[in-house]
Amino acid sequence: MHISPMPNRKTDINNNGGFSTDMIGMNHSYPEASYRERQQIFDAHLSYTLGLLYFIGHDARVPEKMRNEMLRWGLPKDEYTDNGHWTPQLYIRESRRMVGEYVATQADCENRTTVDDGVGMAAYTMDSHNCQRIVIHKDGKAMVKNEGDVQIGIGSPYPVSYRSITPKREECTNLLVPVCLSASHIAYGSIRMEPVFMVLGQSAAKAACLAIDGGTDVQQVDVRQIQRMYDEDPLLDDTAPDIMVDDTAVEPAAGSQWQRVNIYGGYGPSLYKLEPSGRSE
């Protein structure tokens, strides 16, 4: 397990390794399941997770040092007090997604494809936990392998297309989808961060207002008006926007010797550059 310390002597525990807190493959039917079936899936995951923690702390086959360390911990006494100190919901990272006007893919994450109608930026690693366990037969022997784990970094932040949050026009003209947006499995593993959802939600709200005020379909909204909102008031708090000088600012760069500073300092297809002195004037 990957254990990250948090305030008040709490931890954020995540899956780590080939056999851990992920109940691999047992969640596949959740999106299409009834409420009763979803509860059964939840109960199975609860039993698996609590059983794993109990096993580590009590089973004689586990090294004593590890058992003693596990027994130092317990469920948070001040959280979910009406549910046995356990969350009543599963963490749903990815589920059904819309197939919209544009499907974001790995090429977008790697800036091999650049869109001009971006209404938000994403920057997280292309990330997926294992999706299934499969049996491999080789040389007369069988072994179980996990399949689906992906941890691939990206070069720089990339724009998320407005068309990825709008459905195909022939299917619907008054729907905006900032979370279950149109993206491949790999691209969604990068886009799916809460700050990105917040920005896409704000963009969707702005688009809804523009569509209503203009009496148009959401596909006909002038995306430049959404982009202008972020250019003029990026924090949406009426403060002045930052002044960004990079390799697209031709006049400031003229006559100066600029260099790439950090590939992670980029914004879309543009990468920040500074003079050797470090000055950004």
Annotate each predicted stretch with a short phrase.
Residues 240-280:
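Glycan-recognition and processing domains
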Residues 1-236, 240:
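Flavin (FAD/FMN)-binding glycine-rich loop and adjacent Rossmann-like elements that form
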